[in-house]
């Protein structure tokens, strides 16, 4: 049986949220019913006059009101009233690095070019991770990883953000050494942007000061990988700390000189009551780095809160409204699972042509 929701009712209840964004939450919350012979997933760009978003379902969902069939994406059997571009089928091939830019047909705020590295593939630190790469990629050193990056480029002058998803290292010192070496290699090749670290392992005053000293003026954006307020024992079995201790740690990191302090958060896991009770604790010290939770199997589906499972669009609208109330504005970002879609006036207009370069 198909699940469904009332579009007009949502627009009436949330008058400040657009029809495009309502459908964005619908696609995130209900998924897409599609056929794939080889485990591939469809990628779409969808936009109107004001906003654009990308969506890639994690797995087919036969209960979804959204269906992709015969190259057409529909809602309850009708085409969406927007520009809809089917980009390509995603194979989910693991990689040590990737770019967010025009060449990869991934939009970014203000046309920033982002290089994301993940040289620590064999991790198993978080139960929510969507990739199981134990038998596919091994851990490699920063030098070997950056050598792979340099095979296709001469320098790093045009890279605005160097993002490092570290995985779980042996200890804080090893994490700092990795971040420092990756950044220094890039800087020696002309990098003059900022470092974006997503993780939890740099969390002492001594450690953060050593990292900042090693970066030697490179601004640090740090997203502390919290993900949930109340189910951290299930998602982070190897790195659980009491929430109040995490709040104190994030405050210390910010006061130590971190350029932009954030905390990773995944809507879909916490119930709304717990979200309302705890989001305010970070208001004055960090912004959320949001990525809507999308389970990839039955086991992960157990992590979805009853609030989200029963009414995902209303749930996501309420979270968005509360974040905007706390911070006074939308929280735009380059993460494709954000609660806020990309403003048209802040992305490259080429994305509205529907013509990926080189047939990508």
What residue ranges belong to the model's regions?
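Short acidic active-site motifs
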Residues: 206-210, 274
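C-terminal accessory extensions appended to soluble enzyme cores
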Residues: 1-21, 26, 280, 294, ...
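Flexible, acidic/Gly-rich N-terminal and inter-domain linker regions that tether
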Residues: 1-112
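Short acidic, glycine/proline-rich loop/turn micro-motifs
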Residues: 233-237, 300-305
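Conserved C-terminal portion of the radical SAM core fold
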Residues: 217-228, 244-304, 313-335
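Canonical Radical SAM [4Fe-4S] cluster-binding loop centered on the CxxxCxxC motif
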Residues: 105-144
């Amino acid at each position: 049986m198909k699940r469904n929701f009332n579009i007009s009712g949502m627009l009436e209840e949330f008058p400040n949220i657009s029809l495009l964004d309502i459908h964005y939450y619908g696609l995130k919350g209900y998924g897409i019913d599609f056929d794939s012979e080889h485990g591939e997933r469809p990628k779409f760009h969808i936009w109107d006059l004001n906003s654009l978003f990308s969506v890639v379902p994690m797995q087919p969902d036969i209960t979804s009101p959204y269906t992709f069939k015969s190259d057409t994406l529909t809602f309850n059997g009708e085409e969406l009233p927007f520009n809809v571009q089917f980009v390509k089928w995603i194979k989910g091939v693991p990689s040590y690095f990737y770019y967010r830019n025009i060449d990869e047909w991934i939009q970014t705020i203000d046309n920033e070019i982002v290089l994301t590295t993940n040289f620590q593939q064999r991790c198993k630190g978080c139960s929510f991770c969507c990739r199981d790469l134990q038998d596919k990629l091994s851990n490699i050193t920063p030098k070997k990883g950056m050598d792979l990056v340099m095979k296709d480029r001469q320098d790093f002058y045009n890279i605005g953000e160097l993002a490092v998803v570290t995985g779980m290292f042996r200890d804080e010192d090893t994490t700092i050494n990795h971040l420092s070496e990756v950044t220094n290699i890039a800087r020696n090749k002309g990098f003059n942007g900022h470092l974006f670290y997503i993780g939890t392992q740099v969390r002492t005053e001594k450690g953060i000061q050593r990292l900042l000293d090693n970066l030697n003026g490179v601004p640090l954006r740090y997203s502390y990988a919290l993900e949930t307020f109340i189910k951290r024992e299930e998602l982070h079995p190897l790195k659980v700390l009491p929430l109040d201790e995490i709040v104190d740690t994030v405050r210390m990191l910010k006061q130590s000189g971190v350029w932009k302090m954030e905390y990773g958060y995944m809507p879909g896991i916490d119930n709304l009551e717990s979200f309302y009770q705890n989001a305010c604790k970070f208001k004055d010290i960090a912004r959320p780095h949001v990525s809507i939770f999308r389970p990839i199997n039955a086991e992960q589906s157990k992590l979805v809160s009853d609030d989200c499972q029963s009414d995902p669009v209303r749930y996501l609208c309420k979270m968005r409204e509360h974040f905007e109330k706390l911070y006074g504005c939308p929280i735009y970002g380059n993460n494709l699972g954000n609660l806020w879609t990309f403003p048209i006036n802040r992305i490259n207009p080429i994305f509205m042509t529907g013509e990926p370069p080189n047939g990508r």
